[in-house]
Amino acid sequence: MYLKKHESKLLLIPKNEDKEDAGIIAVLTDRVPSVLIVRWFDLFCFGFAMCSYVLDFFSDIGIAIFHFWAGRHLSGALVLTFALIPSVIINIISMVWMLDDEMHWKRRAHPRRTGTFELNQKRFISLGKMITLCIFQMGPLFWYYKALYYGWMFTKNKKDDTDKEKRKFFMKMVEAERDATLLRFFEAFLESAPQLIIQGSIAANYFQNYYISGKYPYWLYFQAASLTLSIISISWSVVVQNRSLRMTRDDKVNIWPHEAVLQFCWRFLTILARIITLVAFVLLFGIYVVFLIFGHLIVTLVHVIFLQALHIEACTHIEKLLLLINAMIHLFTPFNMAEGNTRYRYLVAYTVEFIEMMIIFLLLPTPLDAFPLIEKIRIGVPATFFIGIFIMLIYYKFFHPNRRQDLEAPNVERNEKLVVSELNGIPSAAIEKAEHIEEIEEHSVPTTSESLLEEDECHN
């Protein structure tokens, strides 16, 4: 269990770069499920993610403008810096992926691809529109819109799941969603999470100053709304990242809507408690909180290495980078980046969070005594944390998708035995004829893995 290396489930890492052909990379977790399902909830997830991204980004920009307008230039500069720099990084990555797709679109005239589904379609979006989206910091919306479009085309198609065109729609939707959720995931922890500490500290200071008068400036309400949107954004990004990975795995069961809601509630409550704890550390220690964060990263890195060590063939540098990224994500919320049991990983991570929360609210009470409503905060924050943990336990005990998978496994086994018993009663000549027909179909129709390798837009 300890120091055992696991496969990464955050990134789709190539097995062999020599297999790349016209932009197609065979990746470890790219598998097409045997049963293709796109629910209305999946389409809702795409739309909700687009709305939350836009609201989160522009609310941060609006808060920065409010601060500049009121003459609080330092506060405005901090909010604007932590909003724009991560957004620029994410949109540069998005632009690189778009250009990569554009390059592979131009290479589709390969003789092997003549007459395929791909050549009958125009490019999804023009290069000019791609650049415009990224300039206005809306690059990630392209991938969500693409996933939403192909998901809608899949649901509109009334043909059987074995239909080649319908499977293409599904694979394109999954590919676009994978890119979108990965961008959104990193955007959440590059931009939204640091913004929560910055804006939370600013809001706490001004709340303390205006509490005696009882009259709060209007921008403080907007800042509270912006903080709420950021927490929603982070919580939802973790949920959809998990859901996206499960959708493409034939060995995994996809997340149902009520399971996603439980995951979201658990994440929202624990992240809310964690952010309030970090803001309290900032109010208490100021700039010296950097040393506490550094200490937390060291502790986190140790237990991540012990419990979530990754194995990526011929990619030792990527292993180290992913471990470091995972440790930084743990500053805000535990995240399971590796395959395997999550019990001990979350137990250790949430124990560290609980100890830090108790230190700031119970062992060091004197400096925070002057803060308004501090007694309610000391009770409310741990209560919020434990409610989130309780929802997590309910989720894993009764509603985790693997429980449905375990229940379905015996039925699958019984069906296989039934098929075998039925075949025993079929004449051998009929079986040979069926096998001959199946052999002809295998030579005329591409297999699932071959159709995946024909997919032209997998680039990361």
Curated annotation (Swiss-Prot):
Protein's UniProt keywords contain rRNA-binding: no
The protein's role, per its UniProt record: Acts downstream of ced-9 and caspase ced-3 to promote phosphatidylserine exposure on apoptotic cell surface, possibly by mediating phospholipid scrambling. Phosphatidylserine is a specific marker only present at the surface of apoptotic cells and acts as a specific signal for engulfment. Regulates apoptosis kinetics during embryonic development. Not required for engulfment of germ cell corpses.
GO cellular component assignments: plasma membrane
Cellular location(s): Cell membrane
Membrane topology: Multi-pass membrane protein
Coiled coil ranges: none
Family assignment from sequence similarity: Belongs to the XK family.
Site (Cleavage): 21-22
UniProt entry tagged with the keyword Cell membrane: yes
Family matches, as InterPro entries: XK-rel, XK-related_scramblase
Identification of the protein by name: Cell death abnormality protein 8
Spans within the Cytoplasmic topological domain: 1-45, 99-123, 241-274, 342-353, 400-460
One Pfam entry name: XK-related
GO molecular function, one term: phospholipid scramblase activity
Residue ranges, Extracellular side: 67-77, 145-219, 296-320, 375-378
PTM annotation, UniProt: Cleavage by ced-3 activates ced-8 function in promoting phosphatidylserine exposure at the surface of apoptotic cells.
Entry keywords, A to Z: Apoptosis, Cell membrane, Membrane, Transmembrane, Transmembrane helix
Top-level taxon in the UniProt lineage: Eukaryota
GO biological process assignments: apoptotic process involved in development; embryo development ending in birth or egg hatching; engulfment of apoptotic cell; execution phase of apoptosis; phosphatidylserine exposure on apoptotic cell surface; programmed cell death
Record field: transmembrane: 46-66, 78-98, 124-144, 220-240, 275-295, 321-341, 354-374, 379-399
